[in-house]
Structures are given as C-alpha cells and as structure tokens.
Amino acid sequence: MTPLIFVTGGVVSSLGKGIAAASLASILEARGLKVTMMKLDPYINVDPGTMSPFQHGEVYVTDDGAETDLDLGHYERYVRTRLSRKNSVTTGRIYENVIRKERRGDYLGATVQVIPHITDEIRRCIDEATAGFDVALIEIGGTVGDIESLPFLEAIRQVRTERGAEKAMFMHLTLVPYIAAAGELKTKPTQHSVKELRSIGIQPDVLLCRSEQAVPDSERRKIALFTNVSERAVISCPDIDVLYGMPLELRRQGLDELVIDQFKLRDKVATADLSEWEAVVDAVKHPLDEVTIAVVGKYVDHQDAYKSVAEALKHGGLRQRTKVNLTWLEAQDLEGSDMAALQGIDGILVPGGFGDRGFEGKVQTSKYAREHKVPYFGICYGMQAAVVDYARHVADLDAANSTENDRQSPHPVIGLITEWRTATGEVEKRDEKSDLGGTMRLGLQEQRLKPGTLAREVYGKDVVAERHRHRYEFNNRYRTQLEDAGLVISGKSMDDTLVEMVELPRDTHPWFLACQAHPEFLSTPRDGHPLFIGFVRAAREKKAGGKLLKEARA
C-alpha cells in the first residue's frame, strides 16, 4: 500500500501548493524513491479542456492525451515520472463516474449519496493513480473552507483513519502575512486555517508557512503550540529568487526527513543528491549571456495561459547560461500596426490559441519575422499562422486562411482534421458537430523528420515524439504548391498523412521553424528541450551579429 502525502492549502489560494509538493517530491526522488503526484480539483468541469485560459491558465497535456490542470506541468518539471489522466481528477469526473455506475445499476438500487459513494470514488481514483509507487503526493485544489472541497477532504480523512499515520500524512500550506504597519508576521490566519481543518477531522502533520520573509523560530514555536504540530514540522517557506531552488530550501529544513521518519522508509532511501538542482540555480543566478524574446499571443494578460511556454524558454536559456527576458505582446494589438513593438527583439515565439481574435496579428508577426530575418518559433496556432502568411505573401494564394476563421476562404491551407490515427493505432474521427471537450488530436504522437532540415539538426534524430492538442491541421491539398514555393515540410506523422513541422530554408532565413505539436510540455529545467535550446541559441546569434563563440555554447 503506497504511503500518501495529502497537500492542502489554507487562508488564500495561489500560495504555491503545487510547487511545494513538487519540490518535496523531487527530494524524495533524489533519495532513490519511486514517486508520483496527483491533483484533485474541486471544480465541476470534467477537465480543463473547455475552460477559458483567462480563468484557468493553460491546459497541460499528458502523454496519453489528458487535458489537465497546469499544476501537472509543475509536477513533471520537478520529477522524472511521466503522468497520465489518472493523475488529474476533478469533481466533474468523479460525479460523471458515479452517475455512470448508477445508470448501469452497479449500486444495486441504493440511494446514491456523497458519503459513501462520492468519497469511495475519490478513494478509488487515488488508489488507481498511486499503486506501485514508494510515495505519492496528492494535492487538493482550492482552500480549506471552500464548500467544493469538502468531499475530497472527507475522503482523505477516511484514508488516514483506515491506514494510520505510517501510510498517510497531512501537509498543510498556509499564509503567514507580514503586516508592514506593525512590522511583524501574523500567525492568527494560520491558527484559524488549522482550526478549520481540525473541525472536519484532519490534524496536519506538517505546516508549510508561506511568507514574504523567513518565519523566525519564535513564531514557529507559537504556531506549533497553537496548532498541535511539532515545532520541527513547522517549515518556513519564504519568497525566494529562484523557484527551482525550493527543493534545496526544503531539504535544508529537513522536510524529507519528516516524511521518511513518519513512513518508516529509512532502509529504502539514500543520501539526497540535489546537484542537478544546484546547477539549475547557479545557471539562473550567474548567466553569461542575455536575450529578449517576444511572445505574441492571445491570452498574454493572464501569463499562466502560457506557463509551460515561459518555463521552456527559460529552460532553453539555462542550458547555455543565458537569461531569457520575455516581452509579452497581444496579437490583436499588432493588427494593422507598423510592428514597431518587435524592433530590437532577438527572437519571436508565437504560441497556441483558438479562434479568429488576434489571428491576423499572428500572421503579421510571422511575416515580420520572415522578412526581417528574426528567429521565429511557431507552436500550434503559431505554425498555422506561419503557413497562412507564406501562402498569402509568397505562394500568391490570395485570401488563404484557416477554416477555423473563414470557412469561405478560396484557399483553406489549414483545415479541420476529420480522421487520424492515435499513438495506439486506433482511428479517431471528428466532424464540425463534435463536442468541443476531449475531441481534439491529443497526446504523444511520433513524427519523422526530413534529413538535412533544421528540425533534424536540432533534434539530432530521425523520429521524435511530441504532445499535441489541436483540431485543425495543414491542408494536404496544398503541400505540393507550398513546397514548390519554397516552404520546407520538415516533419510528418509516421503514416505521412499529417504535416507536423514546417521551416524556411537556411539560405533564406537563419532560424524559422514552426511545429503543430506543443514541445513546451516536455521541457524541464534539468534537461531543457532541443527546440527551445536551438531557438534561444539562434536568438543569441542574432544578438551577436551572427557570430557566436563556440565556447559560449551550452
């Protein structure tokens, strides 16, 4: 039976439960344990796939095509375990499962209730996702006191009651605000948050105290006294300059030792080797170069909408000790402009998106990068914008467009995918009447790269696999016409039916590459990703006037 660490939050949301949990997981992994993570979200949506990026941030996609909370992105950036749809569960999915069972008659005529049926389903999902691991960390979304979270909290209370402290730990993240007028930290919100937890039968084993500054020992003792938590288990989590340094900070305070002692794992663990995280922090703090990248998107007012893109760009810089400064530009604002906002930029990235708002701004951005020889990296919608730009302005296909935005376009160079083969070999079919939720081409898909192309050079191999999330695709009827006009199709699906990557010849542009996949989902701070590393290097070369010293490379 896998030992479980349940991570809850109190006082306010957005304190960083996901980062804290992932940091602890990375330490346990560094000590030789097989670790997994899970997110329980209290919203009633079945998954975040149809939620607005302005409300929820990005939708993170796993290998098996699950559309999940962005916290799973944090998890995979900190631990080596690849997650799946089992690791992201919402209230909507729980109720959907229970109602389906009720309709089948699985409950044999019983009155279906929150307790035991909903809580039993939550526990079943937890068991399914965590089986076979040495330790599992499970984050409960929201804040203690929210009515939506109650079934999840009741379920984990039951788990602790049945399994005991050696198999279930409660870790509570709470706010210790600093009141500038008084010049002191206030522990009362934390006391009340723990009181709220205890009122529903949960006594925290560990408190993570988030604050602007380190919580002094005197305040830690006070918190321990009022919350019935060991002083050793009251951990200070102050703001830090480099988030990827959180594993080092938690290790310094012995959080992993608390877990190992409570779960009696001493004979299974080794000494923690956090040298990779030390190297990451050192690269962030001591860069040797600096570039400015413009991200031209549709949801830039909510930067969590592009969380993985922003992190992947930073990772690309880390691998070559380069600080990446991001300039966020709203695509719609560039429509009809003189593109002055892009002057002095070392590289341009156009990320994914949906709908016609801002699409013309993305097309103009691609045109600007192509004509001014600025390194360009298009992702998903960014690739489609690049194809439309090339079709209109190079291949002379007037009014070329995507059918997502103009169904009457005389040259629909981007169209709806109606049929494709999944990674498991199954054939998926869609039409314009299909539901929006869960109907895209999703998950890890292999593609073959064309020899001699930039894509092949950057990846260093012939076949690669990337995660996808798209409903529209390069229209195959225009392959020959656009290739004859000079566009290079550098990546195709393994069955040759879908265009995966396009680029410009190296003799016409130093670095112009666009992909239908979302490579940002496979980038990590310790390893980076070939496309982002190559893109940042191209930006460095542009800044250096095309001459980059070999010894300055990663």
From Swiss-Prot:
Regulation of catalytic or functional activity: Allosterically activated by GTP, when glutamine is the substrate; GTP has no effect on the reaction when ammonia is the substrate. The allosteric effector GTP functions by stabilizing the protein conformation that binds the tetrahedral intermediate(s) formed during glutamine hydrolysis. Inhibited by the product CTP, via allosteric rather than competitive inhibition.
EC top class named in words: ligase
Region (Amidoligase domain): 1-265
GO CC term (a single one): cytosol
Secretion signal span: none
Amino-acid positions noted as binding CTP in the UniProt annotation, renumbered to this chain: 13, 146-148, 186-191, 222
Gene Ontology terms, MF aspect: ATP binding; CTP synthase activity; glutaminase activity; identical protein binding; metal ion binding
Residues the record lists as binding Mg(2+): 71, 139
A Pfam family assignment: CTP_synth_N
Domain called Glutamine amidotransferase type-1: residue spans: 292-545
Subunit structure: Homotetramer.
Family: Belongs to the CTP synthase family.
Listed name of the protein: CTP synthase
Organism: Xanthomonas campestris pv. campestris (strain B100)
Lineage: Bacteria, Pseudomonadati, Pseudomonadota, Gammaproteobacteria, Lysobacterales
Gene: pyrG
